[in-house]
Structure formats: structure tokens, C-alpha cells
């Protein structure tokens, strides 16, 4: 028997020759898979041993699919589109590409689906390039701390729970508590920055609608158009009628569009409305792919689903252009329970949360922010000096007011200090109420909150606070425009401005008429009653044939 001799150099040369002649594209063209079963938006395919994770596959009818489960025998594929025409035995071909979406400035003002295709009937979109959906978030060294404010235009948020550029701020609450209203107002408030033309101030907005009714998405678009905000906004829509795969991918599509701008040195605001429905869609996809279920039937990697998405929101270092992407993820709770599985997951990922309480909403406190449980982990670092200087104790004052209010319900006698605290707290609560689609500018917020926290409103009836605020702001704009301009340009609230505003309050109060039917009439104007002879009257007489009117 001949002796077997192993020569390492021959093996090495053979491997080198094979590697040199290997063409990965050849394998992709030659492999043809077959559908073994299909249904509910999922297909299982055999015969594609070289397929990549998240690779796009093309079915026989042209429909695309996303390779998810790479098992030994077959591949679990999420069908991206109508799956009614996919049947057992059909051919499946590789594309050699991972899932990507088109991106660019031409997406501003448009509504697209999770694959980046326009669905607003305004024609095709010319993309600048394509960007993969699954990309690594910026590393620690590629980031910098959040210190630039992103003004929402909502007094309660900008004063007590500030949001900075690059921050992830969770908005959480039951359904119908005003979560979407906060996002829409925040987008509308960026209009002044956009019209300034300064790239350092402009904020491009992305609204990702996941699992909502088509009529709701249309209403959001209409609201943004009426406010002139669609020109700097992109809507990524995955309505309730879409397959679960689309609802699972929609947030990643929005973040890919935003990352293109962020790495270009621009500022982005992205709203995920809402991630609860994305988690439910991912649970449906995972169960159909026969992945083992965990708590509440969610797959074991549901935390990673949201963490790898939200970690893409960041403030980039100056070496990378200093761009930012600010995230406002929404989570819907059941019965105000923030300790459920998905809410606690997202709370642990984000940089703070704004909790909207249904009881406050039903009590006409809108926005219905629960100050006690809401927090921003960035805090004053993301506030302008003007707001920070006047709102330092506002959150504490409101929390103490809520505690005192609950105590006063059972107490028959309160000392004067407690009564004063309750009176001012009630006025602060009324002051922080804000109708939808009426964002406040920085200088308006400063003047309004200064008046409340310094006791200038203590002599105004609670029912008149809203009207007093509105008319006083108009008075200041008309007679003390320099104060407003100084706050707007310097972002600071000087002692001189405070003194001038104090004089303005003292001059305005005598002119202000309280009461629900009052009007702002100066006292030196004679507002006497009109004589009866000067009034044209009508006399009505009734008879059997009907009523006749005779002018007196």
C-alpha cells in the first residue's frame, strides 16, 4: 500500500487557485429555489443554500421577499407585497442585494411606503442614492453630547421636559390622549427654522405612521399641508391594511431616510407613531416564521428590535459633520400601565419619557402631561438660558400643587401659605394648557412662563388666565417689541427685560377686564348704554294667519 503524503504547499496552492477563480455572482445566478409553502405573508423556500441574511428574493410573479430565517433545509421569507399569487412549487431567484431604500431631498413633501415607493399620486421620486435598512448605529466615539435645544413649541415640554437635538424622547400614554397632536405641533413649530434658510437651524421631519387607519394618515398630511409644514416633511406610511412585514419595516425605512441627511451634516426629527404596533407586527411575523415565543408571545429579540432602531438617533461629532437625528417614539399603554413589557423596554432605551395621563386629558388638561412621572434625562443641557432661568422650579411647584390638591380634598382648614400654593398652582396649570396647532415661539414661552412663575397672574381669575395670556402677549408685541426681539436673538432673558416686562404687566392689568364676557376695553373710554331712541327695533304681532313683523 502506497504511503499517503500530505503536502501543505499543494493544499495552499489549490485553495489560492479556487479563491482566485471564485465568482460569487455566478452562484447567485445559478441558484433557483422553490416555494414549499406560502400563506399569511410568509413563504418557505428550498434550494438557495448561498442566500444572505436580509437578502431580497424575487418570486415568479415579480413580488419581492426578504430572507429572514436561514435554516438548514429551507429559508423563511417575509413577502413584501401581495402574497395572493405565490403558490407552492413556484421558482424563487436571488437578487444578490440586501434590502435598501432610495433616499434624498426629493422625498421632502412626499408620502412613501416602507419600500420608498411614492403612494401620494404625485409621480415618481428621483433619488440621490440608496441606503441599506440594516446599518450600524453611530459608535460612542462618533457621537457628542446633546446640548442644542429642539423647540417643540409646547410650553409644558420646552419648560419642564426639554428635548435636545439627537435625543430619544419617548411619548407614552393610552390611546386618544394626544400623542400624535404633540408630534404634529412639534413638526409645525420647525417652520420658522426652515424658512430661515440656515442649514444649522433647519430641521427635516419624518413622520412614520405604523398600523394607523388610512383616514388618520390622510388627516395628518392635510394638517401639515394647511400649516405649510409638508415642504420639509416626509411621511412613511404603513397603514393597518398593509401586511405585517411592511409595518415591521416602516420605522427602519424612515430612519434610513433620516440617516442620509444626518450624515450629511443636517438636522432631522423623526416620529415613530407608534412602536407598539411595530412590535405587534414583528410578533406576528416571528410566530409565522415559527420562531419560539417568549413573554406575551413576543420573540426573544424584541428588545433588540427597538434598541437598534432608536440607537440610530444621535448627535454626530463635528468630524462627521455635526448632524443630528432626534427621535420621538410613541408607545400606547393599556389602562395607563407603564410597567408592561414593551413600555418598560422602550423606557430603558430612550433618554426620557413624556407620560400622557388619560384622567388629565378627560379633565380638559391638554396636553395631558403627568409631570410626576415624565422626565428628560438630558435636562437643562438642552434648554436655552432664557427658558432655563425662569422654569427651574416650575416642575417642582406643579408636583407640590398636585400633592397639596389631593390633600386639600380631605382637609377642612388650610393655612394661608397652603391656600396661596393652591391658588398659584391652579393658575400655572391653566397657563400650561395649549390648543392644538398653536405652537409658541421661544420669546412667547419666556414671557408667558415668567408671568406665571413670578406671581404676576395671582390677581387674575383662573377662568381668565388663557385670555389674559393671549391679550398680554399681543400687548407686549405691540408696545415692547424690543424685549421680544432681544429674547429671540440672544436666547437670554436679561434683568432689563424683566424690569420692562414688570412695567408692562402693571400697565396692562388696569386695561384688562376679567370675567367670561369681559373685553379688553381701556377704563378711560366711556362705554355707556345706547339710548333707546337710537336702536332700530322690530315688533312681532301674532294672529291666526301667522306672524308679521313691523319695524319700529
UniProtKB/Swiss-Prot annotation:
It is an enzyme of class 7 (translocase). GO terms for molecular function: ADP binding; ATP binding; proton-transporting ATP synthase activity, rotational mechanism. CDD domains: ATP-synt_F1_alpha_C, ATP-synt_F1_alpha_N, F1-ATPase_alpha_CD. GO terms for cellular component: plasma membrane; proton-transporting ATP synthase complex. It is found in: Cell membrane. SUPFAM superfamilies: C-terminal domain of alpha and beta subunits of F1 ATP synthase, N-terminal domain of alpha and beta subunits of F1 ATP synthase, P-loop containing nucleoside triphosphate hydrolases. The record marks 374 as: Required for activity. InterPro entries: ATP_synth_asu-like_sf (IPR023366), ATP_synth_asu_C (IPR000793), ATP_synth_asu_C_sf (IPR038376), ATP_synth_F1_a_nt-bd_dom (IPR033732), ATP_synth_F1_asu (IPR005294), ATPase_a/bsu_AS (IPR020003), ATPase_F1/V1/A1_a/bsu_N (IPR004100), ATPase_F1/V1/A1_a/bsu_N_sf (IPR036121). It catalyses: ATP + H2O + 4 H(+)(in) = ADP + phosphate + 5 H(+)(out). Residues 509-552 are annotated as: Disordered. Belongs to the ATPase alpha/beta chains family. Produces ATP from ADP in the presence of a proton gradient across the membrane. The alpha chain is a regulatory subunit. This is ATP synthase subunit alpha.
Amino acid at each position: 500500500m502506497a504511503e499517503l503524503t500530505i503536502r501543505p504547499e499543494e493544499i495552499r496552492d489549490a485553495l489560492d487557485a479556487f479563491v482566485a477563480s471564485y465568482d460569487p455572482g455566478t452562484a447567485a445566478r445559478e441558484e433557483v429555489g422553490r416555494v414549499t409553502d406560502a400563506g399569511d405573508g410568509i413563504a418557505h423556500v428550498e434550494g438557495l443554500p448561498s442566500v444572505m441574511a436580509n437578502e431580497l428574493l424575487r418570486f415568479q410573479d415579480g413580488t419581492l421577499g426578504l430572507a429572514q430565517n436561514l435554516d438548514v433545509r429551507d429559508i423563511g421569507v417575509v413577502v413584501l407585497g401581495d402574497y395572493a399569487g405565490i403558490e407552492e412549487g413556484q421558482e424563487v431567484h436571488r437578487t444578490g442585494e440586501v434590502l435598501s431604500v432610495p433616499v434624498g431631498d426629493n422625498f421632502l413633501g412626499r408620502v412613501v411606503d416602507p419600500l420608498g415607493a411614492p403612494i401620494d399620486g404625485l409621480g415618481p421620486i428621483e433619488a440621490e442614492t440608496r441606503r441599506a435598512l440594516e446599518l450600524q448605529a453611530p459608535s460612542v466615539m462618533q457621537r457628542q453630547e446633546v446640548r442644542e435645544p429642539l423647540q417643540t413649541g409646547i410650553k409644558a415640554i420646552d419648560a419642564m421636559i426639554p428635548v435636545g437635538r439627537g435625543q430619544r424622547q419617548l411619548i407614552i400614554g393610552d390611546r386618544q390622549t394626544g400623542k400624535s397632536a404633540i408630534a404634529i405641533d412639534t413638526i409645525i413649530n420647525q417652520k420658522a427654522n426652515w424658512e430661515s434658510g440656515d442649514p444649522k437651524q433647519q430641521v427635516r421631519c419624518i413622520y412614520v405612521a405604523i398600523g394607523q387607519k388610512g383616514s388618520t394618515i390622510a388627516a395628518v398630511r392635510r394638517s401639515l399641508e394647511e400649516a405649510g409644514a409638508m415642504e420639509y416633511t416626509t411621511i412613511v406610511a404603513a397603514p393597518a391594511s398593509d401586511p405585517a412585514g411592511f409595518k415591521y419595516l416602516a420605522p427602519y425605512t424612515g430612519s434610513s431616510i433620516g440617516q442620509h441627511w444626518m450624515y450629511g451634516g443636517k438636522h432631522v426629527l423623526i416620529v415613530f407613531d407608534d412602536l407598539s404596533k411595530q412590535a405587534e407586527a414583528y410578533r406576528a411575523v416571528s410566530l409565522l416564521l415559527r420562531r419560539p415565543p417568549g413573554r406575551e408571545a413576543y420573540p426573544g429579540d424584541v428588545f433588540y428590535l427597538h434598541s437598534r432602531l432608536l440607537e440610530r438617533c444621535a448627535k454626530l461629532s463635528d468630524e462627521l459633520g455635526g448632524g443630528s437625528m432626534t427621535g420621538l417614539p410613541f408607545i400606547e399603554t393599556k389602562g395607563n400601565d407603564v410597567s408592561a413589557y414593551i413600555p418598560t423596554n422602550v423606557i430603558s432605551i430612550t433618554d426620557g419619557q413624556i407620560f400622557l395621563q388619560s384622567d388629565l386629558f378627560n379633565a380638559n388638561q391638554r396636553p395631558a402631561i403627568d409631570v410626576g412621572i415624565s422626565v428628560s434625562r438630558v435636562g437643562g443641557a438642552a434648554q436655552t438660558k432664557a427658558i432655563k432661568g425662569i422654569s427651574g422650579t416650575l416642575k417642582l411647584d406643579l408636583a407640590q400643587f398636585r400633592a397639596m390638591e389631593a390633600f386639600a380634598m380631605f382637609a377642612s382648614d388650610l393655612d394661608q401659605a397652603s391656600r396661596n400654593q393652591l391658588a398659584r398652582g391652579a393658575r400655572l396649570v391653566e397657563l400650561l394648557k395649549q390648543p392644538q396647532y398653536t405652537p409658541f415661539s421661544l420669546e412667547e414661552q419666556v414671557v408667558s412662563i415668567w408671568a406665571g412663575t413670578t406671581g404676576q397672574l395671582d390677581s387674575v381669575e383662573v377662568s381668565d388666565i388663557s385670555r389674559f395670556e393671549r391679550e398680554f402677549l399681543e400687548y407686549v408685541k405691540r408696545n415692547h417689541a424690543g424685549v421680544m426681539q432681544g429674547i429671540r436673538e440672544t436666547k437670554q432673558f436679561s434683568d432689563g427685560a424683566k424690569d420692562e416686562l414688570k412695567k408692562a404687566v402693571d400697565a396692562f392689568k388696569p386695561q384688562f377686564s376679567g370675567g367670561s364676557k369681559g373685553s379688553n376695553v381701556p377704563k378711560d373710554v366711556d362705554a355707556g348704554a345706547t339710548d333707546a331712541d337710537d336702536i332700530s327695533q322690530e315688533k312681532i304681532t301674532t294672529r291666526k294667519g301667522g306672524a308679521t313683523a313691523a319695524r319700529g
